Swiss-Prot record:
It comes from Kluyveromyces lactis (strain ATCC 8585 / CBS 2359 / DSM 70799 / NBRC 1267 / NRRL Y-1140 / WM37). The chain crosses the membrane at residues 68-88, 106-126. This is Presequence translocated-associated motor subunit PAM17, mitochondrial. It is found in: Mitochondrion inner membrane. Component of the PAM complex, at least composed of mtHsp70 (SSC1), MGE1, TIM44, PAM16, PAM17 and PAM18. Component of the PAM complex, a complex required for the translocation of transit peptide-containing proteins from the inner membrane into the mitochondrial matrix in an ATP-dependent manner. Its main location: mitochondrion. Keywords: Membrane, Mitochondrion, Mitochondrion inner membrane, Protein transport, Transit peptide, Translocation, Transmembrane, Transmembrane helix, Transport. PANTHER family: PRESEQUENCE TRANSLOCATED-ASSOCIATED MOTOR SUBUNIT PAM17, MITOCHONDRIAL. The gene is PAM17. It comes from the Eukaryota. One of its GO terms (biological process) is protein import into mitochondrial matrix. Residues 1-33 form a transit peptide.
Length: 196
């Protein structure tokens, strides 16, 4: 019965352009109701601030350093396990070196390889634990690196009295440190232009 009433009213309310006024009204109200029923307009996505970015950046560095230490220890222990089971003739040389020296060099090499593979593990752990903030962090990271690249100095003018200030911006962990880095870059440029 309700449908019949709408159809009857629909036939009566035909506008000048041939489109039903009721259809337009229902469509407008349906869209408004749909928009009010969702939270899309009410909650804007929280954009990551610079202090949050620097906090996550520091967390990533801690993850990378800790995983480098852990993988270096694992690799040294693995090499120790391997070398301790070898039968070595003390009268023979290994690659022209004393066996004890060769084994020590092998263990140091394994520790170095473990240390270098650590950031791969650390980055994977950081990505797994950072969750929904990861995309915003990566966008901020690109923005930050673009700012660093734009403002960094030309290292060709360096000297003992005028060293290059943190070329890659690795030591910047806060906004005040970034501002200090900018001041150091401007000071470097000024000194380089005055003394050349």
């Amino acid at each position: 019965m309700l449908r019949l009433g709408i159809n009857l009213q629909n036939r009566l309310l035909v506008g000048l352009n041939g489109q039903s006024l009721l259809k337009r009204a229902v469509t407008r109200n349906a869209v408004a109701i749909r928009m009010n029923s969702t939270n899309a307009g009410k909650t804007a996505s929280h954009e990551m601030t610079w202090p949050e970015f620097f906090k996550l950046r520091k967390k990533e560095r801690v993850f990378n350093t800790a995983s480098s230490v852990a993988t270096a220890i694992v690799f040294v222990n693995g090499s120790w396990f391997y070398f301790s089971t070898l039968e070595i003739d003390p009268t023979q040389t290994i690659f022209g070196f004393d066996p004890l020296m060769a084994i020590t060099a092998g263990m140091i090499t394994c520790a170095a390889v473990g240390w270098l593979l650590g950031p791969i593990v650390g980055t994977a752990l950081f990505k797994a634990t950072s969750g929904p903030k990861l995309l915003q962090f990566q966008e901020k990271q690109l923005s930050f690196l673009a700012k660093i690249q734009k403002n960094r100095v030309n290292p060709q003018s360096q000297s003992f009295s005028n060293p290059v200030p943190d070329y890659y911006g690795e030591k910047i962990n806060s906004i005040p440190q970034y501002r200090q880095w900018l001041r150091d870059c401007h000071s470097y440029k000024r000194k380089a232009s005055e003394f050349l």
